[in-house]
Amino acid sequence: MEKTMSNTTPTPAAHRLGLVGRKVGMTRIFTEEGESIPVTVLDVSNNRVTQVKSLESDGYAAIQVTYGNRRASRVTKAEAGHFAKAGAEAGSILKEFRLDPTRAAEFTAGSVIAVESVFEAGQQVDVTGTTIGKGFAGTIKRHNFGSQRASHGNSRSHRVPGSIGQAQDPGRIFPGKRMAGHLGDVTRTVQNLDVVRVDVERGLLLVKGAVPGHAGGDVIVRPAVKAPAKKGA
């Protein structure tokens, strides 16, 4: 079997500068050849640096980034002081990106990171978001179980999961048993999405395919950690 990992050059997480933003929604764009490409629009505009961490003061190098805005009544005193110290407007989300010390030193608190300085068309990215919550779901919807007979003697057991254990030995249900429960509302990352277009004026990223979460949900966009190596590299 051919190994697929040989064509990839994993990038250390400590060297991946990303941006935070929100999912605007899905649409499609057309190429010059008339091909329809489904894309998700991500708003990553106005990413402000709220803190720069260094090896000397914090033990590691990183930058802290915020996105969006928040009403003053929704900001705690501690957060208000943190944003005021950075000279940045209070945001709705805070995210830290670990970087190489030299790279982190290039940023200053209060500065804005432009989308074109991080991403470009044709690049592959990893997008992290919170999936849409589905509430309490049964095994058919949650784990793709098959249903039982609709008739022929079956009554009130059409969508039940069936046996969930054995007998007195082992006398318990094994951990990890697939059963009914809460579905969705978890953090998930979709890898290797192609950046189709970068809207510099509006700070938008158009990535091919779907990303986790509902429209308006927070997302984190990073350069793909498993991006294929460039030819000739």
UniProtKB/Swiss-Prot annotation:
Recorded hits in InterPro entries, A to Z, give: Ribosomal_uL3 (IPR000597), Ribosomal_uL3_bac/org-type (IPR019927), Ribosomal_uL3_CS (IPR019926), Transl_B-barrel_sf (IPR009000)
Modified residue N5-methylglutamine is at which positions? 168
Family annotation (PROSITE patterns): RIBOSOMAL_L3
Q: Which residue intervals make up region (Disordered)? A: 147-170
Subunit info here reads: Part of the 50S ribosomal subunit. Forms a cluster with proteins L14 and L19.
Post-translational changes noted in the entry: Methylated by PrmB.
Spell out the protein name for this chain. Large ribosomal subunit protein uL3
What keywords would UniProt list here? Methylation, Ribonucleoprotein, Ribosomal protein, RNA-binding, rRNA-binding
Listed GO biological process terms: translation
Which Cys pairs does UniProt list as disulfide-bonded? none
State the species of origin: Bordetella avium (strain 197N)
Q: What does this protein do?
A: One of the primary rRNA binding proteins, it binds directly near the 3'-end of the 23S rRNA, where it nucleates assembly of the 50S subunit.
Xref: Pfam families:
Ribosomal_L3 (PF00297)
Q: Name one GO molecular function term.
A: structural constituent of ribosome
The family annotation for this protein states: Belongs to the universal ribosomal protein uL3 family.
CC annotations in GO? cytosolic large ribosomal subunit
